[in-house]
């Protein structure tokens, strides 16, 4: 009886730890403009991911922990010195996310694709 109670407690503890595991977010920033991106910063959930030297028709990637409800703050600086900034997208705990962030010459667009639920 004592062993079975310990086993049940261990299972409950393991399930609790699994449910508290941080979810992951990944993004691909695609340069769809005609100009090289000198640097880009993507901030979300208190984390900032820096990307550099993204040529036209190429991309860079980043990842973060989904530990808040929030949106991306994206800042792009082109090689010419021109900048674009946008707050967009949405993440929430309990899901993993895979996003494509497309940078054109005049806008930043995002495609949100939750990848699974951690229930």
Predicted regions mapped to residue ranges:
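Bacterial N-terminal signal peptides that target proteins for export
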Residues: 1-8
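C-terminal motif of bacterial Sec signal peptides marking the signal peptidase cleavage site
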Residues: 16-19
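Bacterial signal peptide processing site
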Residues: 21-23
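Asparagine-centered strand-capping/turn motif at beta-strand->loop junctions
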Residues: 27-34
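Short acidic/proline- and small/hydrophobic-mixed sequence motifs that coincide with surface turns
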Residues: 36-39
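Intrinsically disordered, low-complexity Pro/Gly/Ser/Thr-rich segments with frequent PxxP/GP/PP motifs
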Residues: 46-68
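A short, solvent-exposed beta-strand micro-motif common in secreted/extracellular proteins
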Residues: 69-80
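Extracellular beta-sheet/turn segments enriched in Thr/Pro/Gly and aliphatic residues
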Residues: 85-119
């Amino acid at each position: 009886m004592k062993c079975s109670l310990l086993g049940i407690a261990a299972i409950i503890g393991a399930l609790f730890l699994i449910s508290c595991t941080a979810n992951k977010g990944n993004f691909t920033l695609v340069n769809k403009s005609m100009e090289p991106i000198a640097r880009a910063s993507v901030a979300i959930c208190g984390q900032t991911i820096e990307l550099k030297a993204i040529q036209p028709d190429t991309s860079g990637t980043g990842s973060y922990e989904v530990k808040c409800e929030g949106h991306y703050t994206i800042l792009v600086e082109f090689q010419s010195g021109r900048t674009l900034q946008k707050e967009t997208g949405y993440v929430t705990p309990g899901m993993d996310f895979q996003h494509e962030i497309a940078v054109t010459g005049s806008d930043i667009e995002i495609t949100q694709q939750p990848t699974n639920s951690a229930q």
